[in-house]
Each structure stands twice: as C-alpha cells, then as structure tokens.
Amino acid sequence: MEMETKAGKQKKRSVDSDDDVSKERRPKRAAACTNFKEKSLRISDKSETVEAKKEQILAEEIVAIQLTSSLESNDDPRPNRRLTDFVLHDSEGVPQPVEMLELGDIFIEGVVLPLGDEKKEEKGVRFQSFGRVENWNISGYEDGSPVIWISTALADYDCRKPSKKYKKLYDYFFEKACACVEVFKSLSKNPDTSLDELLAAVSRSMSGSKIFSSGGAIQEFVISQGEFIYNQLAGLDETAKNHETCFVENRVLVSLRDHESNKIHKALSNVALRIDESKVVTSDHLVDGAEDEDVKYAKLIQEEEYRKSMERSRNKRSSTTSGGSSRFYIKISEDEIADDYPLPSYYKNTKEETDELVLFEAGYEVDTRDLPCRTLHNWTLYNSDSRMISLEVLPMRPCAEIDVTVFGSGVVAEDDGSGFCLDDSESSTSTQSNDHDGMNIFLSQIKEWMIEFGAEMIFVTLRTDMAWYRLGKPSKQYAPWFGTVMKTVRVGISIFNMLMRESRVAKLSYANVIKRLCGLEENDKAYISSKLLDVERYVVVHGQIILQLFEEYPDKDIKRCPFVTSLASKMQDIHHTKWIIKKKKKILQKGKNLNPRAGIAPVVSRMKAMQATTTRLVNRIWGEFYSIYSPEVPSEAINAENVEEEELEEVEEEDENEEDDPEENELEAVEIQNSPTPKKIKGISEDMEIKWDGEILGKTSAGEPLYGRAFVGGDVVVVGSAVILEVDDQDDTQLICFVEFMFESSNHSKMLHGKLLQRGSETVLGMAANERELFLTNECLTVQLKDIKGTVSLEIRSRLWGHQYRKENIDVDKLDRARAEERKTNGLPTDYYCKSLYSPERGGFFSLPRNDMGLGSGFCSSCKIRENEEERSKTKLNDSKTGFLSNGIEYHNGDFVYVLPNYITKDGLKKGSRRTTLKCGRNVGLKAFVVCQLLDVIVLEESRKASKASFQVKLTRFYRPEDISEEKAYASDIQELYYSQDTYILPPEAIQGKCEVRKKSDMPLCREYPILDHIFFCEVFYDSSTGYLKQFPANMKLKFSTIKDETLLREKKGKGVETGTSSGMLMKPDEVPKEKPLATLDIFAGCGGLSHGLENAGVSTTKWAIEYEEPAGHAFKQNHPEATVFVDNCNVILRAIMEKCGDVDDCVSTVEAAELAAKLDENQKSTLPLPGQVDFINGGPPCQGFSGMNRFSHGSWSKVQCEMILAFLSFADYFRPKYFLLENVKKFVTYNKGRTFQLTMASLLEMGYQVRFGILEAGTYGVSQPRKRVIIWAASPEEVLPEWPEPMHVFDNPGSKISLPRGLRYDAGCNTKFGAPFRSITVRDTIGDLPPVENGESKINKEYGTTPASWFQKKIRGNMSVLTDHICKGLNELNLIRCKKIPKRPGADWRDLPDENVTLSNGLVEKLRPLALSKTAKNHNEWKGLYGRLDWQGNLPISITDPQPMGKVGMCFHPEQDRIITVRECARSQGFPDSYEFSGTTKHKHRQIGNAVPPPLAFALGRKLKEALYLKSSLQHQS
C-alpha cells in the first residue's frame, strides 16, 4: 500500500493488501475512491499547462490524471502521481501548513507528473488549484526516509518538491515526518531503550538538517513533537503483524508524548492567543482543554510561532563563525600562549637583505586575490623591536585596526607548491640550514595568514600588502616558534580525523574530544598532555588555529559539529579583544616599509627579479601602451574577444581532460570558423561630378576599359591610392580600400576594384596596434566610384633591413612620429602607412606582394587566390578518367592513399574501446588513416545533384600492426604495413592524401625520429579471413612506389653520404640548401630541448646560449659542448653586449644590470655574440603569470617592466636576426587579457618582421603526452616565413584555436582525432623496456637488461648501452602504502583505494583514502587522476617540474610498479633521447625536463624552417 523511495527504484502505491502492508507501513486514513480506471492520454506541448476552474475541479483533476498516465500504471485500481513545485492553500489562495487540513478545506497548486523514475524526462501538467485534499499520510519507515502523501477523492500524490514560496512551511512538516521515521528506526532496533538514548540517537540521525542549529535544538524539537510522533507510530499498529513492534503501549514513546518539557509549552507558557472576540485560549488549555476546533487552531498557531522562533535562532547562530561573529575575530592573547613558546629572543642575521618593496612596486590599489604568490624559505618572524614573535598572534582573516605588528625575513623564490608533510618529523622544526636559490628579503607588515591541508600536506601562507608567501622551512633560529603552530595544526587535524571516523560527527562532543586527546601516546605528534585541564587549556588558547582548519573545510556537518560550536563558545567566554573583520578585498600598497631591517642598507642580489633591459624601441612600444591604457581602462576595451577565453583558461593550466570543442569534432580541420558576412557598402546620395582623367590604359579580361586616374567630386583617385567607403552598418567604422584598378563597366558605370585595408585594432593586435598602421588583406571588392566618400593619405612603407640600418631607421621613424603628432595636434587628417599583409586564415602578417599591388592592369592577386582555392576545393575526374583531382592533389591508378578510418567498417578494422572518461586515455581507440592502393576509378551515371561526385574509387587495403593486436603494434615498426586482398568501393571524399609504400630494402638508411615523411614498407601478406600473416604468394605481385631520387639509390649502394634529411622533406635531398646552418642564440635555453630539435633538423647550430639556473645551464653545456653558455641574467648579458658595441644610449637598463655587466670577466666579454653574427634567435621567456602563478595588477607598467619577454624582444630588435622563434605555454595567448601576446607581435612588426602565430600540440609529432605550445615565428622581410609542420600522429587533445576579432578562430594544426598518418605513441611504447626500480631509486647508471621492443624505444635508445637517470623521488610511508593499494589497471586512482585505516611504523593510524579528496570530490571532477596509475595503452600526463600524487597532474604512478615515474621516463615522454644528460639533483632534473620544449616538436619546426630556406633559395635561382 506504500511507496518505496530508494535511489533509482520506486514502487507505486495501490489499494490495501496484505502483501503490500508487509513491505511498507503507515497510519491508515480515511478510505478513498478505488474504482477509478486509468486511461492513457498523450501530452501535447499545448496541454502542458491546464488552468483549473473552480466549478470544474473534479473534471479537471480527471484530465490531469489521464494526461499523466503511464503504461506501467494502467492496471492500478487507484491512480498514484508525483507532485512537484506545489503549494497547499485555503479557498482564498493563502498557503497553509499540511496540518491545517484538520480544520478546513485545503487545495493543491502545482505540477502533476507520472509516478515513474524522476531521472526520466516526463512532461507534467500544471494546475492553479485542484482538490479538495481529503487526508495526508507518511510512509517510508522501513526505508529510513519519509515519503509524504496527500490524497484527494480521485488519486494519491507523492509530494516531492515544494515551490520556493511554500518551502519554509513544508520543510518544518517534513522535519516532523523525519523525526517520526528516526524514532521508528530506533525503537524497531531496541524497543527497551531509554528516552535519553532515544533522543541522542535521533539527534545524531538528524544532525544533517539545515533548520537546526545544534544537536540540542534537535532534541528539543523531538520533545516538542512527542504527541505528533506518538500518534503517527501508534497508527502503524493497525496494519502491523504479530512479530512487529507495537508502538501504542511502548513506554518510551508514551514517555516522549507525556514529557513535561514540551517545547511549545515552555516557549509559549505566558502567551495568550485570541481565537475570536469572545474566547481566549491560554497555553494551559492547549494541554488540558477539550479538543474543540479552537483548541486545535490554537495548537497550530503555537506551533507556527515555535517554527518561527527556531528560524530566528538558526539565523542568529548561523551568523557566528569560528571564534565568534562573522563581523569579529577574537584576538589571541600572547600571555596565555607564552608557556608554549621559547623564551624571548631577537632576530639576528648577518646577511644583507633587500626591501620587499623593491621587488613589488607600491602605490596601487589592488585586490588581494591578484597579488603575486611566492615561496619563503629560511624565514623568521619578529616585531618592530626585532623580537621573535609567534605567527599565531596575527589574525587569520583580514581585520581592521590590528594592534599587532609582525614583520618577517627570508629567502624568496618562485612558488614551487611545497608544503609540510604530516608525517615528516623534520618538516616544521628542521635545524638544517638549507641553501635555497633566491634572494634574501625583509617583508613589510604581515596582514593575515592562513592554513590549508590535504591528505598528507600542510600549507601555511601569509600575506603582506605586496604578495602572498607560501612558507617553506623556517630558519634554525625560528624553528621552535613555528613548531608550536605546526603542533596545533596537527592537533586540529587529529581532532578532524577523530570526527571523521565517527558515523555521525555529532556523536563526538567537545568533552569527548578533550578526553581522547588526553589518551594519545606521547610519540604522537598531536600529543599535548595526559592531564585533562592542560589539554583543554591548550585547545582553547590556540583555538583560532583549530577553528580555522574547520572553517575552511567544505563539509557543513564538520563546520557545525558540537565540538566546533562548543570551542567557539568557550573562546567567546574568555572576553578577549575583538577585531573587526574587513569585507573589502582591495588594499592600497603603501610605498614605505616600516620593517626594522629597513634601516640596514640592502645589497643587490644577483638572483633579484631585475627590471628588464630593453632597447628604446621595445621600451617605447610597451611603455606607451601602458601609459594610454592605464589601470582605470576596463579590460573589455583592450580585447573583449579574449576575455571569455581567458576566464576559461585561468583554471585550465594545460588540462589534457578539457572538453571537446564541438567545432573540433568535424572530420575536416578548418582554420577559420564563422567567417564574417561581406559588408554592405552604403551609397552616397549627393550628386557629384565623376570623370576619368587620362587615356585608356588597357582592358580587363572582360574587355572593359581600364583607367589610372579619376576625379570624384573634389577628390582625385589614382590606382595605388586608398579611398574611404561608408558601411551600411552603424556599428562599423568606415572602410579603407586600396585601389588595384579602375574600369568602366559595360553599362557605363565607373567602377573601382580594390582590397580592404584593415586597421590594426581590427586584427589580432587589438589595441596594441599603431593607430596609423593599416594592413592589406586578401578581401577584395568592386564598388562604383560614386560610392567613395573620400581619399586618405597612405604610404606603402619600405625600410632597409638589417642591424646596420637600425639607427637610421629609428631616426626616420622618430621624425615620422613627430610629424604625425603635429598633424594630430593641428586637427589634420591622419597619415596612414602600410607595410604588411594580414591574413587571419594563415595566422600571420606577411610582406606585401609589392610586385602585384596597384598595377592597374585588371589583375587582382586576391581574386586569383580565391579562384585557385575554389578550383582546388573541387573534386573532378581527369580527361582519361583513370584518375581525379581533389584538394589540389592528383590521384592516379596505382597511387597509395590515406583513407579516413570511419569509412572502413568491416570487422578487419579493430575498434578499440575509447577511454575518454579516463585521464590520459583519450587516445585509446583512435585510429590512424587506413593506407590503401587506388585500383580503379568507377564512373557513375550522371548525378542529378551537382554537388555529388560522379564517380567512386576502388581500393585495396593495407593493414597496420595495431589492426591485428596491441602486442603486434608494440613489437612492430610503426611504418610497417601488411598487404591484403580486401577491396572497398568508396566515395572520393574518403581519401585524405597520398603516401608511398616501398620494399623494406628501399627505405631510407637513416630513418629519423620524429617521422615527418609519408613512407611505409610492406613485406608480408595479411589474410583477414584467417587472421594470419604470410609471405607474399608467388602469384601475387605488389607494385611498390617508385623511387625517383637517384641520390638515395646511390647512397644505398654505398657511393654517397646520408644527409640525415633525405626522407622527410618536400625538397629533394640533392637540393638541400648548401648554406651553412643558421648561427643561433638560444635565450632562456634551459637544458636545451629546443636547440636539440632544431640542430637535429639540420637547420641551426647553437653557438650561444643564455640560461639563468645553474643546473640547467650545466645540462645545456653537457649536451651542446660547442656552444658558449652564459649562466647569467639575460638582462646583464644584453647590457654587456650593447656596451661592447657602443650603444649604451639605446639601452634602457637598471644600475644593477650595468654594474653586473661591468663585472663580467674579459673572457666572457670576448665571447659575447654581436649583431651580424646571429642569424636565428629562439627561446621561451619565463613568466610565472603565463601559468597562473602571478598576475599583474591591472597590467601596471611598473610590473610589466620586470617581464623577461621585454628583454627577449630587445635581443631581436638589437640583433635583427633573419629568424626569431618564441615558444611558450598555451595561456600566453590569453594571459593579461591577451595584451602580452598582442604587444609581442606589435613589437616584432614595428621592427619590420613578418610574424606568424599559432598553437601546436606536441603529441601530434610523436611524443606520448599532451603539450600545447604557442609558437610565434618572425622572419625578416627578405626571408620566407615557415609553414606549420603537418601533424603526423593521432592525438585527441582539443583546444588549439586562437580567438581573433570579428568572430574568427585560427587553428594552426588540424585536429588529428579522426585520423593521421601514424598512430599515437603509447606509454608502453615509451617506457615499456625500462628495467624495474624501487621507490626512491637513486642509482644514476644501470644496465638496460633487455633489448628495445617498440619502434619508439629503438629510436629513443639509439646506441646507448648504459641507462642513465632512471631514478625517482621517494614516496613517504603512507603514500607508498596507497600506491601499493592502487589497482594495476587503466584509470585506477585514489577512488579505488579501500575505505580503511592503516597503521604506520610510528604507530599513527591514518585513513588510506585521503579524506580531503573524498569530501570535496563532487566539486572537483572527482579529483580524477590523483594517485593515478598510467595506462599502458594511453598517454603520459603533461610533464611537470615536480611529479607527485597530489600535484597538478597527479597521475604519476607506474602502470605495474609501486613508485612515481622516473626522470628518464619523464624525459622519454618529452622525446629526449636516452643519450641526453641532465644535471643536478632529482628535483633539478625533473624541473629541467618539465620546462623544456619537446625536441620532436622543435625538430618539426626546424624542418619547416629548412623548407623555407630552400624555397627562398629556389626563388632566387628562378629570378
């Protein structure tokens, strides 16, 4: 007769029966009509809302029941429905509590739905009013969750969700029902329990309710509802069976009903309720008086008053936070905590320190959330007298009028995410003096601090007005002071663990916690004392730290547990000083540091975050921008297009699990989406004289006469000039058009054909562009001369190129800017200039096609490009019908081609199961292109649809090793194919390009990694019907690709020398440029990943490198012994170079940089690179902001000056190399609202470079990890800009598009999710041959033990016989246990840990499953991947500088071994060969690898640079 409410399962309520009664029980109510038959009726959209009329209530309810009928309920004798968004109200429409049904008529307003599963999307019917409600019932006793039913004469309704306006009234009744269910559960288990035990059990069960402020409030509520609960449970006896509990005579239930301290009586004992003018009922009458209607009404009124009093009490209590009111913070008394700290001592430091304000320029109002974050090592805190002081006396919230002044000193470094291990005995009180790379500084006043803790880490952070500082280990001198803080933190975490082990946190009272703390073992880090009073004193006086830990925890049950509320209350009772908590998050950074150390003259450190050394050109461009767009300028005005993308990427941090872009799920990669519609030109209405000036110059291809000059009104328009056009759109500015030619049409209209000139603000440059510079585009248009609004002054600018012309060009440009400023001051029209072509579809700015511009001959290069593209996009048969042309590629019978894998649907194509839900498993199941041979072109009958191809292609298929099995794929060459006799007839659009299939003996002798050519070999036959590989049958002959390269044939015969680049380029090997490799300067070189790849491509030789970190610089030198490596600040090196060349006047640098440059020894100065010696500059300037660790305060110029990007660009400006390459993280594009990205390109364009930008995915070039990199190429106007390398491997990692103005998006590399020439490289391919090592392995050199198995292993191992750097970080005891418990299967992570405790060697008992992760998983994507194992068939995670199971990546456990991945395994994931050496500690080596550019990506870029050099050389030969 009742309804179950278990997850995903519901049982309908039907007429009374013995069977149903046995399953569900509830009080029996008045019988209702049971002879109603259901009828299915389809709900239409128009019927979703039906408005009931009072005179048709019964009829309309019948319609509702019919409309919401389901097939499952057709046979039920009495309808059951679901009710949501409902209100119970009287005849006047006033909402009424459920209990009012006993006094008057109640009606229903809400949405009626079928009773089925809530997860199903079903249409409901809304009614304004129906009923009357006959009775209500409560069920769900056996399930432990109340279900409230209301019944009319026709049906029963399960009340699911009240409307918002009815929620408060209904929630109170629902809590009454919950109390009934909880009492039922408790008495069913133990009918003989005492009343106190019953109240305690119910209080624990209902502790999660939001309407009760404490466990005591729950008990009072249950007592107040004693009579209600008794009546409900007594009603169950009518349907109870003999063996079930009898409630009507249960002594505990009777005692609850009769309890004297009924809350209603106690709260309202003196309240008189006026029922009408003639009768007053007091609270005494409510108990002893007759149960007439007035008394019932009075009871309900009193209960409503009690409900409101509960709500007022709850609101009052909820305003109290840890330690008191949310408005106040209780100050800790230094006297009370003094006994827990050492005797007074003073801070002494012989090292000279630098003022914090030197690093972070003050004077700006900033949001505390925007402050930079750093790490502070070897630190000490002290007051204004230099006496050491506890961090505890500072507030943990931002407070006003703090009367405690705390300063600090330490070694500042970049935030490395370090913290304190809970089980590390030396973490907080280490007496070892560790030397840290960084600068000794003294801090300004510390304003607040906070504690964060995870599974086994503690993070303590403090804030000044300048920055946030995550605390590393304190100094030896200060360690005892910090030891007390850490001990208190451990006490708090111990209490937290105690509570979490309880089934209900409310079970553990404050007194119980204190007792348990007394019982801790002395070797427990949370041990205080065995004496109860001592423990309680310690907990109370240090209570703010403990309360802060609980306050920051996301679980509401923890925040308001009895222990927390009691501790907060005891702290309030101490009556300490209260500080007002500030709500304002913005602070004003003051310019004076009151730290006592400020009186000691600071020494400038070599490790200081030095202001960038720049050329005057770079300084001017960036400085002028920030002087115009000051902090007051809203960011939307800078680059609105990038704001949304930046907000998304702020939290992304190279997340390889980002959602697929719907546009990236298309089979064909498209570079430009959402192309804007052509603008409509607004005609000029006024009459004006238009006439040609001069003779006819020729004719167009259509025979129309051409002219070179025309008079349009008062303006003279000539070919090669620029005109203004009005756009028929109020939101658009005027168009400027470059005149290509003018002609008179056949209808005698005077016409102009030209190309649009775009303002810089309309390009990717945004507001970083020069307002006078226009960019030619390939958008052309034809308009009538009468539509011209006017002309503009336009200079097609050209400057001599080279470092030797810098000064001359600077002087010319300076005069030009002065003239332009004078014209602007005098109100004269702007003089524009143009020196570049902007092509958003190619992602770059290119040299102007000067030879094709303004010829006046009727030729337009843009029209020609468009015609070629249209022709290229066509698919058509050749004349002989034995081949066809598609996407510009000619195909003939016998050609080997790529076919999209989704067109091959036979069982022969093994379909791997996608693991997109697993971290690092997105590539599993993705397929490379299917290689086929074109056998024939089948011409079809003429298609009626012109868009359909009139032919199909017949193909024979080659199988790949991965089509056979994973084992076969692992052990086989990635370029190997198996011939088959399987044939397919497919449409031509299935074909994606051509490749070569050769005999294995005809393969290039030196096959490179990574692969950049399209060559395969085949030597066996695959029988798909049997699944066996065989030798070619004698009667089967395969026609292989012919080798047209005679040089390769000679090399195969031993008569030539292998060039190393013969197989992977578009050029022929004997046509490789004979010029020497480019002399290269690598800045921010790291360990040399970028240089290694470029050198292997044969395009560059790194002669000089600059690296800031000594271990990385040493590694670079080991691997590039011929290079001159400067381990120094690049600002100092640039200053020294400009001094050496006598260009100090053009150098903007600090005194510090000048002094350090002067200190360089003569040997260093003699080896400095000079302008004219450097052909190529490359590097990846570090900026912590690009990766989310530091953000400028509204882009203030003072802080921008410290960015290394300025120095990097200044190297390019001063040296003017032929080529320049910038590499950085993906977020570089959107960082700082895109301004840094835009200003970088604007600076290069100002220098005269051509510029190309894009985002590439390293995984598509042969590494087993997702690693997107922003690439900016710059080439001198005399060179050819390199094209983007073609992605060669399948890889599913979307998000490589760059947003451009006008709704455009540029994608440099096509998405290979749907196919590529080769499969993705797996974890097993990468590290499967490496020998097993134990946790914490530290032996540098060892034997391989096995031969390489996979193609990748053979390439990456090379000729190495000794394995180096197969070492790993050690896991602590708890994490090692967790690692061993993580199942060795794909996707396993912390969620697979058993929910149990483990005892550590020190006797501590810890949760195996990290509690912090369990409680917050729902809000953090389940913390997917933390403590995760790698998948042999998946990819490795993003290579980071410090792999750890709780880090940003988290998935760092070996697939089969219980350890973190090693240094060598990380290096392989980046594509470093085993011969590559790293330097320093294990942490240094991980950092070098994590910061490096993957060499395969650099190799691919280098090969495209080599092609560009070849193209220039060939063009020069042609001319």
Curated annotation (Swiss-Prot):
Name listed for the protein in its UniProt record: DNA (cytosine-5)-methyltransferase 4
Lineage of the species this protein comes from: Eukaryota, Viridiplantae, Streptophyta, Embryophyta, Tracheophyta
Cross-link (Glycyl lysine isopeptide (Lys-Gly) (interchain with G-Cter in ubiquitin)): 583
Function (record text): Maintains chromatin CpG methylation that plays a role in genomic imprinting, regulation of embryogenesis and seed viability. Required for proper patterns of CG DNA methylation in dividing cells.
Keyword hit for Cytoplasm: no
Residues the record marks as active site: 1183
Matches recorded under Pfam families: BAH, DNA_methylase, DNMT1-RFD
Composition bias type Acidic residues, residue spans: 642-668
Entry keyword annotation includes 4Fe-4S: no
Catalysed transformations (reactions): a 2'-deoxycytidine in DNA + S-adenosyl-L-methionine = a 5-methyl-2'-deoxycytidine in DNA + S-adenosyl-L-homocysteine + H(+)
Expression sites (tissue/organ): Expressed at low levels in vegetative and floral organs.
Single Gene Ontology BP annotation: methylation
EC number: 2.1.1.37
Biased composition range(s): Basic and acidic residues: 1-24
PROSITE patterns registered for this protein in UniProt: BAH, C5_MTASE_1, C5_MTASE_2, SAM_MT_C5
Similarity comment text for this entry: Belongs to the class I-like SAM-binding methyltransferase superfamily. C5-methyltransferase family.
Region (Disordered): 1-31, 641-668
A cellular component term, taken from the record's GO annotations: nucleus
Molecular functions per Gene Ontology: chromatin binding; DNA (cytosine-5-)-methyltransferase activity; DNA binding
Residues covered by the BAH domain: 715-849, 916-1033
Coarse class of the protein's main subcellular location: nucleus
Domain SAM-dependent MTase C5-type: 1078-1512
Gene3D superfamilies (alphabetical): 2.30.30.490, DNA Methylase, subunit A, domain 2 (3.90.120.10), Vaccinia Virus protein VP39 (3.40.50.150)
Cellular compartments annotated: Nucleus
Source domain of life: Eukaryota
Record keywords, A-Z: Chromatin regulator, DNA-binding, Isopeptide bond, Methyltransferase, Nucleus, Repeat, S-adenosyl-L-methionine, Transferase, Ubl conjugation
